[in-house]
Amino acid sequence: MELYAQSVGVGAASRPLANFHPCVWGDKFIVYNPQSCQAGEREEAEELKVELKRELKEASDNYMRQLKMVDAIQRLGIDYLFVEDVDEALKNLFEMFDAFCKNNHDMHATALSFRLLRQHGYRVSCEVFEKFKDGKDGFKVPNEDGAVAVLEFFEATHLRVHGEDVLDNAFDFTRNYLESVYATLNDPTAKQVHNALNEFSFRRGLPRVEARKYISIYEQYASHHKGLLKLAKLDFNLVQALHRRELSEDSRWWKTLQVPTKLSFVRDRLVESYFWASGSYFEPNYSVARMILAKGLAVLSLMDDVYDAYGTFEELQMFTDAIERWDASCLDKLPDYMKIVYKALLDVFEEVDEELIKLGAPYRAYYGKEAMKYAARAYMEEAQWREQKHKPTTKEYMKLATKTCGYITLIILSCLGVEEGIVTKEAFDWVFSRPPFIEATLIIARLVNDITGHEFEKKREHVRTAVECYMEEHKVGKQEVVSEFYNQMESAWKDINEGFLRPVEFPIPLLYLILNSVRTLEVIYKEGDSYTHVGPAMQNIIKQLYLHPVPY
């Protein structure tokens, strides 16, 4: 640390140091030894897939059978293996939906149908739930398997949009009901209820994380489909092996930067950056995109910490100018520590350029570089606020903070390596224009960060967060602010849900990519800022995803 402070003639005491903890993983992910049994597992998975495709098609004349099969396929995290089959099944279910709901008073089936169809953009009406009202402020709970039905209703409410009062009321009712009966429930229902109430609904949970949990829950149900369960286990482990190989490759690259010794002031978070990338898309066909995103996020994290936790104002001006110019000749003008980060930035994007040429989409390199410049400008503006000890209003803060959260840059980076049929030039322009769908994700990204991280930021010289801005501006306490921000995030989720309803401007897979980025944020900030402070909860998730195979 002292070496770099001396290199620019600045003492450590005058820098906004954050004292981040070191990497918790050591060299655990550098070496990867593939298992010899993978070829046999892959062959077995292919055989099961063929059989299950046939079975799903045969279920087309049985509404409930097809409905439950699609739900299981999605919850088990294997829907990417059945994209066309699931699309066809949902089209079939949509055509039968109105007639089914008219002649059926099954709360569970109605809610499940509604959720599955809404998830895929079908404009099904929330009026199907009117028949379950009890004439007061609540809903009639079925006598048999009431908790299971109400749980599915609770899950369905997370697909609501603005103006759907029946679902707003149902959200409160179902949550309160499940909380009141939870102590009387047995597993596996109790586990599902606990997860939905205290962790994530299916709509907001990260697919790969939720699949890992659901596999063990699904297995406990006597009615589980043995073929689906076996395929889910095989596929999870095969994809995990791919992720381990990618993470090993990224870890070896990261080690060459010598972050712990040469950049000891930054967050050493390569593994967590890869988690973020695999959260956006875990599927094997996104391997190139995932590798681009993981490295891009790792470098963005270094940049963030240079601006936020070490650089002086004068140094940051030089750094920003160098990023704007994007030229190796700028290296000579930068302090030693900045040279490492700047060279890493240029090197990564040189690799990205090569990959994009292979993909036949070289035009995307421009957008990737513009996204990094976009972040640098925002970080610099925040540094100027810090230098001037500026106290922004909440509105002024949010205008800048929805840029400094890095989420626009994240989305652009996540699109770079995706196939052309999903991402186009128009899609990049759309993201940069910040339409309501993107704006909603930015609000969630910023507020969830500030709610969990503002106490840490108060410990050092830092621009105040949305929490402090709102408290001072409205003369209210922290709890009132947090409550208000959660309401704003619920409103933003409604905007996201609205953005999925057909007709859509861009392909549903692109919208899901963006949605998954929001879901990843929610996971990371569930127990505080688990990217900055990698605690037991985040460590356990990473172990479950990359280190511990699902037992057969």
UniProtKB/Swiss-Prot annotation:
Temperature behavior of the protein's activity: Optimum temperature is 40 degrees Celsius.
Keyword Disulfide bond included in the entry's annotation: no
pH and activity: Optimum pH is 7.0-7.5.
Enzyme class per UniProt: lyase
Main location: cytoplasm
Protein's GO biological process: diterpenoid biosynthetic process
Record flagged with keyword Cytoplasm: yes
Catalysed reaction equations from the record: (2E,6E)-farnesyl diphosphate + H2O = patchoulol + diphosphate; (2E,6E)-farnesyl diphosphate = alpha-guaiene + diphosphate; (2E,6E)-farnesyl diphosphate = delta-guaiene + diphosphate
Any single Pfam family the record assigns to this protein: Terpene_synth_C
Needed cofactors: Mg(2+); Mn(2+)
Record-listed Mg(2+) 1 binding positions: 304, 308
Cellular component, GO annotation: cytoplasm
Binding positions for Mg(2+) 3 per the UniProt entry: 457
Signal peptide: none
Keywords linked to the UniProt accession: Cytoplasm, Lyase, Magnesium, Manganese, Metal-binding
Subcellular location field: Cytoplasm
Domains (record comment): The Asp-Asp-Xaa-Xaa-Asp/Glu (DDXXD/E) motif is important for the catalytic activity, presumably through binding to Mg(2+).
Quaternary structure (record): Homodimer.
Protein name: Patchoulol synthase
